[in-house]
């Protein structure tokens, strides 16, 4: 397999074949909290992808010099440093979105996807493959967030990226926003539906009967 094919596989596999939310069931809490708007889902995707990619790369660079007894602490220190950078950049340039994301940017530090890839992949792999793996898993996470955020904002408020798409009753149109879509349980339903759709096309992901 060529280098280009390896890169493509590393980036695309976490989107559908091994999605961190849909298959591994990681990072679900933030998926419920930040998907009421497509804008916040998109920014959270960028933030997690940035942190996952660079933390993977950084951990991989020093993996042979990290004592086994403190490896988790070192990984968390690297992840926390990157999260602080992301948080400060959002506060400086996207303050309104930063307020909407609230504590969930800081909680990227404990996101199972970020920590899991650092421990399971970056500690055992070279820097460049680790960087690509981080990008792929960030995009896999973002695929679910953006899909859920699209439907929640569209049907919950009749808007996308804050712009009216469905003519609202309050503005003389025909669409009455569905308030349920703005509540966290709707994200559970949508994620469940998305998992079902993925498994219809990829039946190998269905768990074997006990």
From Swiss-Prot:
Q: Does the keyword NAD apply?
A: yes
Which InterPro entries does the record cross-reference, listed alphabetically? NqrD (IPR011292), NqrDE/RnfAE (IPR003667)
Q: Identify the EC number(s).
A: 7.2.1.1
Where do the coiled-coil regions begin and end? none
Q: Enzyme group, top EC level?
A: translocase
List residues traversing the bilayer. Answer: 42-62, 72-92, 103-123, 131-151, 178-198
| Keywords tagged on the record | Cell inner membrane, Cell membrane, Ion transport, Membrane, NAD, Sodium, Sodium transport, Translocase, Transmembrane, Transmembrane helix, Transport, Ubiquinone
Q: Membrane topology type, per the record?
A: Multi-pass membrane protein
Question: Would you say which domain of life the source belongs to?
Answer: Bacteria
Q: Where in the cell is it found?
A: Cell inner membrane
Q: Name one GO molecular function term.
A: oxidoreductase activity, acting on NAD(P)H, quinone or similar compound as acceptor
Q: What does the entry list under GO cellular component? A: plasma membrane
Instruction: Name the chemical reaction catalysed here.
Output: a ubiquinone + n Na(+)(in) + NADH + H(+) = a ubiquinol + n Na(+)(out) + NAD(+)
User: Which cysteine pairs make disulfide bonds?
Assistant: none
Instruction: Name a single GO biological process.
Output: sodium ion transport
Q: Quaternary state and partners of this protein?
A: Composed of six subunits; NqrA, NqrB, NqrC, NqrD, NqrE and NqrF.
Xref: HAMAP family: NqrD
Function, in words: NQR complex catalyzes the reduction of ubiquinone-1 to ubiquinol by two successive reactions, coupled with the transport of Na(+) ions from the cytoplasm to the periplasm. NqrA to NqrE are probably involved in the second step, the conversion of ubisemiquinone to ubiquinol.
Which family does the record claim for this protein? Answer: Belongs to the NqrDE/RnfAE family.
Name listed for the protein in its UniProt record: Na(+)-translocating NADH-quinone reductase subunit D
Q: Which organism is it from?
A: Vibrio parahaemolyticus serotype O3:K6 (strain RIMD 2210633)
* Gene designation per UniProt: nqrD
